[in-house]
Amino acid sequence: MPLSYSAAAAAAPSPLAARSRGLLRRPPRSSPVVVRCKKIDQLRAVNGIPPYAPVSNRSLLSPVTLPIIRDANIKNDTRLRIFSGTANPSLSQEIASYLGLELGKINIKRFADGEIYVQLQESVRGCDVFLVQPTCPPANENLMELLIMIDACRRASAKNITAVIPYFGYARADRKSQGRESIAAKLVANMITEAGANRVLVCDLHSSQAMGYFDIPVDHVYGQPVILDYLASKTICSDDLVVVSPDVGGVARARAFAKKLSDAPLAIVDKRRHGHNVAEVMNLIGDVRGKVAVMMDDMIDTAGTIAKGAELLHQEGAREVYACCTHAVFSPPAIERLSSGLFQEVIITNTIPLKEDKSFPQLTILSVANLLGETIWRVHDDCSVGHEPYSSLDID
């Protein structure tokens, strides 16, 4: 039986399906895999879900030719403005290209003492402004830049200001696990609100409860549909598939993911953590012998948890192990662990820009630009963003 989505997921309508067509190709496995498409064609929706867009290999903010899927008359909507911070300009450009818009003109620079200067170089008075800026490493600098961008838009009389944060830094500091600790996620939420944002758009928060830290509306979308689409295109027999949660805390996410992949069985790696960035795998709950194991998590930081989990899966007889995540933080020694031969493939998205020295042959990068671009348009057009697959994976 071929690998496919569940019937419920396959039946879910998509606004992209009626407008998109084209060809997706993968380069040879001898180099890091980046999903690309013919620039003259539009992307094809598979099973009624949004396709994965090409990932630009440009590191600087410059025009790129990408397929425009959204209606061309968006260009006539002069109230919609998209500005990019310096954290991930290539993703911002892809989002703007999806919407058929040009990025807003903005001047961002650093003074000699490290202070950040932001000046909007076009009017935003009465406009619906979206600021694309993940707070990825260096988290403090990117966060401060976002706050100053929000303040600049507020003082320039923007009607609505939405902070589009593909990766929300400090999301893991969402509770007090020990006495006298800070809940930094709540502090950052307060700062964004006080700076003047009217709304926040985030992708794959570490815990959904963190949405409650904001006193303004939060649109929470999941990057997993992009990964699901890619996995469904691979020739993996559904009877051989098992989805693995690398820890107990990710069971709900992995269960929702497994349900979409032909309702695959679920396994759980039980671990004990002895300090920050250190994980110890204890045992496996479930059967992976002779199976293709797909490990799903929201992020990979040092890769300690997922690498030790992969070792355990191989010991328990797994035939192949895939690692999937939305946010590739990849702090040292993540690259060494992920490229050590434990994984058949490491599948990530581009919510965080990846430097060239962090690439390796098993790496596949998928783009969330279409996902975020469609959500931005729905927010601007006062449409629901709760339509599958844009926000919900039925995670409970």
Swiss-Prot record:
Binds 1 Mg(2+) ion per subunit. It is an enzyme of class 2 (transferase). Signal peptide: none annotated. One of its GO terms (molecular function) is ribose phosphate diphosphokinase activity. SMART domains: Pribosyltran_N (SM01400). One of its GO terms (cellular component) is cytoplasm. It is found in: Plastid, Chloroplast. Belongs to the ribose-phosphate pyrophosphokinase family. Its cofactor is Mg(2+). HAMAP family: RibP_PPkinase_B (MF_00583_B). InterPro entries: PRib_PP_synth_CS, Pribosyltran_N, PRibTrfase_dom, PRTase-like, Rib-P_diPkinase, Rib-P_diPkinase_bac. It comes from Oryza sativa subsp. japonica. Residues 1-36 form a transit peptide. It holds the Pfam family Pribosyl_synth. GO terms for biological process: 5-phosphoribose 1-diphosphate biosynthetic process; purine nucleotide biosynthetic process; ribonucleoside monophosphate biosynthetic process. Its EC number is 2.7.6.1. Keywords: ATP-binding, Chloroplast, Kinase, Magnesium, Metal-binding, Nucleotide biosynthesis, Nucleotide-binding, Plastid, Transferase, Transit peptide. This is Ribose-phosphate pyrophosphokinase 1, chloroplastic. Residues 290-305 are annotated as: Binding of phosphoribosylpyrophosphate. It catalyses: D-ribose 5-phosphate + ATP = 5-phospho-alpha-D-ribose 1-diphosphate + AMP + H(+). SUPFAM superfamilies: PRTase-like (SSF53271). It comes from the Eukaryota.
